Design a protein with these regions (language model features):
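Conserved class I S-adenosyl-L-methionine
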Residues: 2-65, 171
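Class I SAM-dependent methyltransferase SAM/SAH-binding core
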Residues: 71, 77-122
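A short acidic, Gly/Pro-enriched loop at the edge of an enzyme's catalytic core
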Residues: 121-132
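A short glycine-rich, Lys/Arg-flanked "PGG" loop and its adjoining helix->strand segment in the class I
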Residues: 146-158
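Conserved beta-strand signature within the Rossmann-like core of class I S-adenosyl-L-methionine
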Residues: 160-167
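Short alpha-helix
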Residues: 175-190
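Core SAM-dependent methyltransferase catalytic element
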Residues: 202-227
Length: 227
């Protein structure tokens, strides 16, 4: 869900209503009202075959090889949830926008997927644990990102992964979280961090981009450590 950065189509996807940004304030947006046109953006709806193929390939490399349980936070209309389900994973999607979730449920009808209304910072999943927590363009909107990351880490099974797709968007008043900042937030957690830069792959966005876009894949130890 894209904030107004002053550059149409350059905004990120965030959950239905974020809090204050990690590095900059997230604008307030009525995501229920935006849901009908949300998938019109190439990297939101993944309607273009080349864009869809690009995201599918990246997601396959980020998620665990074996099919498992994936928690998609700020899932929006469920485009990444659908790719994960098609790759054999059982998906739980969480978003604050009922209108977005209505579209996600329709998109994943017949797949092993459930969608819940809730806050990405405190997902309403009880004591469940997952093999991967997938979050695209959401962390930057949340206050206390270090605390949020620790909570997401606590929801992983041993050997699980945090897959965080983030960036910095706009030139006049940039919003987002730089890769170096996110890597620093993950540094205190026991695990392995890999940063993958995405700005130079126009297939992901349906066009060339010149801002900072990246994915961080954080892998937890195979044996659980103390929170």
């Amino acid at each position: 869900m894209a904030p107004d950065t002053g550059e149409p189509g350059d905004g990120p996807v965030t959950q239905g209503a974020g809090g204050g940004g990690a590095d900059s304030a997230a604008p307030r947006v009525d995501w229920d009202a935006a849901a009908a046109a949300f998938d019109d953006e190439p990297d939101h709806g993944l309607r273009d075959a080349d864009v869809r193929r690009a995201w599918s390939g990246r997601l396959r490399s980020w998620l665990p090889v074996r099919p498992g349980d994936v928690l998609d936070l700020g899932c929006g209309t469920g485009s990444l949830s659908l790719l994960a389900a098609e790759q054999g994973h059982a998906v739980t999607g969480v978003d604050l926008s009922p209108a977005m979730l209505e579209r996600a449920r329709a998109k994943l009808a017949g797949h092993d997927a459930v969608f819940l209304t809730g806050d990405a910072a405190l997902p309403p999943v009880g004591e469940r644990c997952f093999d991967a927590v997938l979050v695209r363009h959401v962390l930057w909107t949340l206050p206390e990102p270090a605390r949020v990351l620790r909570h997401w880490r606590s929801m992983l099974r041993p050997g699980g992964r945090l897959v965080l797709v983030e960036g910095v968007w706009g030139s006049t008043a940039p919003v987002g979280i730089p890769a170096v900042r996110l890597a620093a937030l993950l540094a205190p957690l026991a695990g392995r961090t890999r940063v993958e830069h995405l700005s130079d792959d126009p297939a992901l966005w349906g066009r060339a981009v010149d801002d900072e876009r990246y994915a961080v894949v954080w892998s937890s130890p195979v044996t659980r450590t103390a929170p």
